[in-house]
Each structure stands twice: as C-alpha cells, then as structure tokens.
A protein has these predicted regions:
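Polytopic alpha-helical membrane proteins, predominantly small-molecule transporters/carriers
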Residues: 1-297
Length: 297
C-alpha cells in the first residue's frame, strides 16, 4: 500500500506539467498563480492532516516553500526554452540522483542484503530512461543551440531546488506531515516575490490564470502524499517513485502538446519509457527487501 501511495504523486506531477504546457500565459502571471494555488491547497492539506506547527517545522517548511518557488520559476523557463518533453526527464534524473545519494549516504537506506545493488540498478534504468526521453538528433526539429543552452541551465537549477527539500526536512528532523502547512506559507510568500520581481509585461489578472492555479493545487496534493510516503518507504524510494510522472509528461508533451520529434527520437523515447518502467519494478523490489531494516541516523 505504501508503494501505491508513493506512485500517486507521479500522476499528479505529470498532469501539472501538461497543464502548464497546454495553457501558457505571461510568465509572471503563471508563476504567481501556481504559487497561490499550491500555497492555498497546502494549507488545506495541513488542516486535514491536523499536524502541529513547531517553530522548527515552520522555519524549515517556509524555507522549503521558497526553494520550490525558485525551482518552479526555473522549470517554467525551461518549458519555454526547449519544451516539456525535454525538461521533465532531465530534471527528474538529476533530482533522483541527488535524493538517492542523500538517502543512501546520510540516512542509511537500502541496507538489506542485495537492496543497494537492486536500488542502484533501478536508479540507473530510470535515469537512462530520462536521458533517452530528452535526447535530440542534431538534424531534427527542435530548439536552437541558444534555446538548448538556456533550457539546460534552467533545468539543472530547477532540479537542485526541487530535489533538495525532502532530504533537507529529514536532515533537520522535521516530520514531513508537519512541514506541509509551513510550506504553504513559503509558497504564498513566493507568490508575492514572483509578483514583485519577475518582469511586468502584463497584469497579474488575465487569461489562463485558473489553469495555473489548478496546476499548483495538483502539486500541493502530490507533495503532501510524497512527503508522507518518504516517511513510510524512505527518501530514496519515496522521492524516486513520486518523480515517475516524467513518463506521463514526456508522452503527453509529444501527443497532447504536439512537441516535434523525429521518428528516430520517438523510438528512443519509447525505449526510455520502457527502461523507466523496469526501473520502477526494481525500485519496488528494493524497497520491499529493505522493509524492517532500521536506517541509521
């Protein structure tokens, strides 16, 4: 059951990417609306969970909310530079590498005999699948070299900011459920910063603000489930399973958003998706092997 819960965020995160890609609008308006939706729903999730707000949880939760705000700004920049189907696989792979490394090295995950080897193989397959999904032929349709450079830089920045907060909360010993509400406050503060700092090319209120706010709400629900799942199955496994939404985002980017790919690129993407699914199965096995082994602190 814990594995099934850990998979739900991947569907929500994948749908979020497609929603933002399908309804683009002014970058300041879109970012602000996403943060407002995410912040408001996070506060609602916190009320439903009924978790206490300690001083430590509030401080670190707000910090994590601001980190996610920065990651979202960069990922939307990357979407516009080189598309959803290239951004999501790469940012996913980098986040997986970061969190799995921290989960194993700092928190002693995958300690059961054979679990570490199986987990590493699973991660390698998922990362290989992500790389395959973002691969582009030199002569094929797609972004210019300048757009690829901007997209790569923005994607790397988003991965660092997105991928750090689950392990940060565990490192400072803040229960994940306790951080959901404070993260909502950080996201609302991030909305204010987006409104103040990002270029003012259009008014905040305008077309397609509702889909952006809805996307933020989807993320907040997925985030609450992800943070709870990391407590049940560990950071390395919980975060990894939640990030498999890149499969949905990649396929949706090609079919729903109509992002251009050559026939060879589509074949490589299909192979990448297959590799990621195999990695998912192995990740579930590694997690089940690790059950009952207490991680070191």
């Amino acid at each position: 059951m814990s594995i099934a819960v850990a998979l739900v965020p991947s569907l929500l995160f994948g749908a979020l990417s497609l929603l933002l890609g399908a309804f683009p609008t002014d970058i300041r308006r879109q970012n602000t609306a996403v943060m407002v939706g995410a912040g408001a729903v996070s506060l609602g999730c916190a009320a439903m969970l009924g978790s206490p707000w300690s001083l430590s949880a509030t401080v670190w939760g707000v910090a994590c909310g601001l980190m996610w705000t920065g990651g979202q700004v960069f990922v939307l920049w990357a979407f516009r530079a080189w598309g959803v189907s290239r951004t999501m696989p790469l940012t996913t792979a980098l986040q997986l590498l970061l969190n799995a490394t921290l989960g194993v090295s700092l928190f002693g995950e995958w300690r059961a005999p054979g679990a570490l080897i199986l987990g590493v193989v699973a991660l390698a397959l998922i990362m290989l699948g992500a790389a395959a999904c973002s691969w582009q032929e030199r002569t094929g349709p797609g972004p210019t070299p300048a757009q690829r450079r901007d997209g790569l830089l923005a994607t790397v920045a988003s991965a660092v900011l997105y991928g750090s907060y689950p392990s940060l909360l565990r490192a400072v010993e803040v229960p994940p459920a306790h951080a959901v509400g404070p993260m909502g406050l950080g996201l609302l503060a991030g909305a204010g910063l987006c409104a103040l700092i990002l270029p003012r090319r259009a008014p905040l209120r305008g077309p397609r603000i509702v889909p952006a706010a809805l996307a933020g709400g989807l993320w907040a629900v997925g985030n609450a489930l992800m943070l709870r799942s990391t407590a049940a199955v560990g950071v390395a496994s919980g975060f990894t399973l939640s990030q498999l939404g890149f499969v949905l985002a990649t396929l949706g980017g090609l079919t729903i958003l109509g992002e251009e790919r050559t026939g060879r690129e589509r074949t490589v993407v299909a192979a990448g998706v297959a590799a990621a699914v195999v990695g998912l199965v192995l990740m579930g096995l590694a997690t089940s092997m690790d059950t009952g082994v207490s991680p070191s602190q």
